[in-house]
UniProtKB/Swiss-Prot annotation:
Acts as a transcriptional repressor for zinc finger transcription factors EGR1 and EGR2. Belongs to the NAB family. Keywords: Isopeptide bond, Nucleus, Phosphoprotein, Repressor, Transcription, Transcription regulation, Ubl conjugation. GO terms for cellular component: nucleus. There is a cross-link at residues 126, 129, 143, 211, 332, 354, 368, 372, 452, 463, 475, 478 (Glycyl lysine isopeptide (Lys-Gly) (interchain with G-Cter in SUMO2)). Homomultimers may associate with EGR1 bound to DNA. This is NGFI-A-binding protein 1. Residues 160-187, 398-432 are annotated as: Disordered. Induction: By glucocorticoids. The NAB conserved domain 1 (NCD1) interacts with EGR1 inhibitory domain and mediates multimerization. The NAB conserved domain 2 (NCD2) is necessary for transcriptional repression. It comes from Mesocricetus auratus. Residues 220-309 are annotated as: NCD2. It comes from the Eukaryota. The gene is NAB1.
Amino acid sequence: MATALPRTLGELQLYRILQKANLLSYFGAFIQQGGDDVQQLCEAGEEEFLEIMALVGMASKPLHVRRLQKALRDWVTNPGLFNQPLTSLPVSSIPIYKLPKGSPTWLGISCNSYERNSSAREPHLKIPKCAATTCVQSLGQGKSEVGSLAVQSVSESRLWQGHHATESEHSLSPADVGSPASPKESSEALDAAAALSVAECVERMASTLPKSDLNEVKELLKNNKKLAKMIGHIFEMSDEDPHKEEEIRKYSAIYGRFDSKRKDGKHLTLHELTVNEAAAQLCVKDNALLTRRDELFALARQVSREVTYKYTYRTTRLKCGERDELSPKRIKVEDGFPDFQEPVQTLFQQARAKSEELAALSSQQTEKGMAKQMELLCAQASYERLQQERRLTAGLYRQSSGEHSPDGLPSDGSDGQGERPLNLRMPNVQNRQPHHFVADGELSRLYSSEAKSHSSENLGILKDYPHSAFTLEKKVIKTEPEDSR
């Protein structure tokens, strides 16, 4: 089975590693799965590495996996073992500035390309030098091919570790290209798109900032000898001086400045790189900001927040636009399954309304019951009061009948009692009896409605009571024998 040949620089590096591990049979599988980036294999965690091994069909052969791991470790610690003469290969996955200096494809950096390219851009936007392109010339048949490569971000530079990194990595910063006295910097820099976004944002912000007074700056430098010794020469340079921007970048850096105590090998983050670039651009617009680092830091952070948000949002949208995937936040509703959420909510609201109505009705029934009880209590009290009045009336009747009879017996005062004996005749009975019957009629009318609904027995007792009391009074009277004298 013929092995495919590498076509790019990334594929060539993978080819050399697999060749050293005697695993060239997996080269085609790696290329089919998009595994032409060796750094991805070196940086992958345990789970991700095992997943890659499963994709290329190496997971079932642990000895092959160990040979590949050993080759990757050798490539990280000593990349020189894998350097082979390169042919005319297009650079795709590995940036050219990370090639060793001895590589035939390394031809150095041309800073003049910045002046050539900047003239074709808008005149009011000044492109930073860290976004300058590099020239790459191939060796094929004496013909040169010029290609532009943007400087990669800090995430890629972190992948190159080991003692060979200081030898193989070549800085593209203007400080290394320009003055030899400039501080030593790493290859960390923003890519062209991010640097251009910073320049645009600084251009908008510079129009809103107040213009600094040059006389005040000179007075400040005159009073501060240390500051004047450090940055005084920058204010004496003309704007056409090519080294002025390099010096501004040198002393305007917020993070990782040449006089900072940052540990060697500690790389700057994307935020720190953006802040440094924004500070440099702001100081290029207004040199006086070099003397006010607190204000410069605040403005640079503001630019960094805006640029990072816009750049990340744009990049994310571009990546998401290439995928035809559903949003993870979208609720998936399958066809054929009705949505019961709304009917359940409607039923719940109806049940709540019914329960509220029942509670209101029960409270009303309770109030009506209490009112009925109060009415019954009042009627009972009135009934007892009338009974007491009736007893008093009966007592007065007996007393008055005794007063009119000289021998203690009532005298006859009506014609209807003429047939009765004298001792049974009761005077004033005709006058007093209607009083009781009137009271009886009033009581009947008063308790007729209450007695029908609550107690029918009370009404019978109440109606029969005056008659029984009257007959009882008649029965109490005893007849006395007539005196024979």
